[in-house]
């Protein structure tokens, strides 16, 4: 028997599940367009779908932010219908044998920084920056990286006055320990700087294949968090970025130098990584490591056409320079 949501969407296969509930694919019964549907039990002890739907509404219209098409309660479930996206960067990382090239890391970093800056501009911090929460799109948006999962997001300043939340200590760790900033481990209230620092660890994870504080043995969750914190604090930025370009050292040192209420200089960070991109002679052609592995034949063809166009332009520029 076909299950329908809002008498408009036919529920299909299950895509996954999380602490909040389950995610399904659904089709519009008229247009046959596919969507993602999040289901959360109305009896959930820690409901987050209502909060998340409000966040999506606030962030609505932003590049790389999924659009919500319907939210409501039906039967025993709170339901949210939103854009169906492609795999996460974590999925693609696994697909690429758990190592990304420098070019792919820099192209993803550029987009991820843009997404984080946009969320911050709307007065919220994400508080769970990790590869699983960045997804590529589908079809025409296959090269666009989206930011998702705002269940842990928090307002860090007043919308009108821009008064920042107060500095606090003794907070429990919110987010994912692997990528959490050192200040988050120390129990300090999170602010913009922590999202940016977490991104730095994500980038090093992509470049190295793993982080030094992964796979630590522990007897409890608290013990594991403590061991991750100890290892993170004792591993210098220089050691963490040993085989990487100095720009990554600069990036992380900058993040750690920020004060609680500071607005990160997103433009400076983008320029820092863009300069490295240019110095390496890369072309921003949206050909990621996963492109040929994941993309459909149609998408592949489109990307190769783009690459040929870029190559022809580069060849022409080279000829022009030689002729001058």
UniProtKB/Swiss-Prot annotation:
Transmembrane segments: none
Domain Protein kinase: 9-278
Gene3D superfamilies: Transferase(Phosphotransferase) domain 1
GO molecular function: ATP binding; metal ion binding; protein serine kinase activity; protein serine/threonine kinase activity
Annotated ATP binding sites: 15-23, 38
Reaction equations catalysed: L-seryl-[protein] + ATP = O-phospho-L-seryl-[protein] + ADP + H(+); L-threonyl-[protein] + ATP = O-phospho-L-threonyl-[protein] + ADP + H(+)
Listed CDD domains: STKc_CK1_delta_epsilon (cd14125)
Class of enzymatic activity (EC top level): transferase
GO terms, biological process: peptidyl-serine phosphorylation; peptidyl-threonine phosphorylation
Subunit description: Interacts with rhoptry protein RON3; the interaction is direct. Interacts with CK2alpha; the interaction is direct. Interacts with nucleosome assembly protein NAPL. Interacts with RAB5b. Interacts with host GAPVD1. Interacts with host SNX22.
Known function: Serine/threonine-protein kinase likely to be involved in many cellular processes. Phosphorylates rhoptry protein RON3, nucleosome assembly protein NAPL and DNA/RNA-binding protein ALBA4 in vitro.
Name this protein carries in UniProt: Casein kinase I
Source species of the chain: Plasmodium falciparum (isolate 3D7)
